[in-house]
């Protein structure tokens, strides 16, 4: 609970709000949104794609790290990458593909200094303690990620009305 309280305190700050505003700008300037993630992050990508579509910004999700490369038809495509570690090789490989077709990239990650964050035009970090079970299963809270998605979508909804 303490780590969630710390995140929500951070979410009230100027830096976080600037990140949300920049994400909204990238979304409204794009023609197409792709949400990408693997594992738990893939579930967050799917949730985000549905929520963006629900508020009028058509989006698809990719949770298959071997999905084919985007084509030149992806003009003004926005890729939103979800990754707790920010170091998942397959997600990094996908970011390289999207960077190759001049897509804007937003990352939502727990590590603002990660490879994925450095490859992104905008990173929205959430700084929550990682919880890894002995058999290497990540059970870190995804509450901050859901909050970020919903915060962006509420702002998009407000702008449309």
At which residue positions do the language-model features occur?
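HTH-adjacent hinge/linker in prokaryotic transcriptional regulators
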Residues: 1-19
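Amphipathic alpha-helical segments that line or abut small-molecule/effector binding pockets
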Residues: 2-5, 21-24, 146, 150
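Glycine-rich phosphate/diphosphate-binding loops that line cofactor/substrate pockets in enzymes
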Residues: 18-30
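Glycine-rich phosphate-binding loops that contact phosphosugars or nucleotide phosphates
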Residues: 28-160
């Amino acid at each position: 609970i303490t780590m969630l309280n710390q995140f929500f305190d951070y979410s009230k700050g100027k830096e976080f709000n600037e990140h949300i505003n920049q994400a909204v700008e990238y979304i409204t300037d794009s023609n197409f949104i792709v949400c990408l993630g693997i594992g738990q992050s893939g579930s967050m990508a799917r949730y985000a794609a549905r929520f963006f579509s629900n508020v009028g910004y058509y989006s698809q999700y990719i949770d298959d790290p071997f999905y084919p490369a985007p084509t030149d038809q992806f003009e003004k495509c926005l890729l939103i990458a979800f990754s707790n570690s920010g170091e998942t090789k397959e997600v990094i490989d996908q970011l390289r593909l999207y960077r190759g077709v001049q897509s804007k990239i937003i990352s939502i990650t727990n590590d603002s200094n990660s490879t994925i964050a450095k490859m992104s035009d905008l990173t929205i970090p959430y700084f929550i303690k990682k919880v890894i079970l002995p058999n290497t299963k990540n059970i870190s809270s995804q509450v901050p990620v859901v909050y970020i998605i919903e915060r962006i979508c509420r702002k998009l909804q407000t702008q449309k009305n």
